[in-house]
């Protein structure tokens, strides 16, 4: 896709980092294993998958790596993967054992805490938002991640409508990936603590699964009284962008965010209250109600991450903190040090760094063979806005300036000045 896109725009071709044959060969290497059972992953390496409490199928991985010295015990490593919070729908919380040499832990919410909420509290919060959007008179758009978040929303909406807490508002699920994921959730619902038999907890007469592009486009004619759940969750791709284009300019419409919005994404910009955004190359004024519901997170917060780490100690040789924005990584590192760890053994690895791990001593940093793929200051920018955001803002500012200019000569003068800067 990127190759074709560059060709259409007259840009240089992109050298692929792998071929289709290589991708298909990699897929043939996939083997299904059961959780909570040790497997021989390679000579001298055992692995075990345990429930991470994040989404259906998410797992932490325990490794035991045999020492080259026969008298030395195997090194024990734990990779957290994404860790789920306590009290999450469809989950009993993260599982696993303790007593490791090294722990690698995620830090998505390493610097913040959320208010704990029960199932009843979560549904009450969703009910308030849906009723407020319904009263406003427009459609309710919910950008949602296709796996787990969408199914949680459907489950809660079905339950609220079944008990009469919400009117049976038409709900449209407009995400091909979410449709496929929902069938998987239905197949394995017994693993979610839901009854194996009976009606699907994700379906009802007023829940409509949108399967074709034509059906999705038809939703653009809706003006009120509907809930549209579509991906992507951060509004960076998918069908939600078309629904935003159709509804953001309507003051009676509502956009409800139910998940994390990375800095620089359209979702984050809308939450910040920008007056306009660019979608599909067009400026769209933001008049819709922008709301957020922070009760569906799939990630443990600071308090829960520290509890997860504490329950898996000791980590004799070190802890690596990964997968987070700079503030989250630094915040969680400080908190882990406060637990009594030597700061030198609580490591926030940088891109392209390589470490050698030893069962009897601390991890050793090996200098990368080549220069980092990012410029010195670029890593700090990865989690924030990039030039694409600046470009979109510049285009919007230029359009506003041209519209506010009274006469044609003044507009042409402004454009000439800009062109001189570019030369």
Model-derived features: positions:
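A short, flexible N-terminal coil/short beta segment enriched in small residues
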Residues: 49, 84-86, 163, 168-190, ...
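Short, compositionally biased "basic patch" segments
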Residues: 89-108, 179-180, 185-192, 261-286
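Glycine-rich phosphate-binding "P-loop"
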Residues: 107-123, 142, 201, 287-307
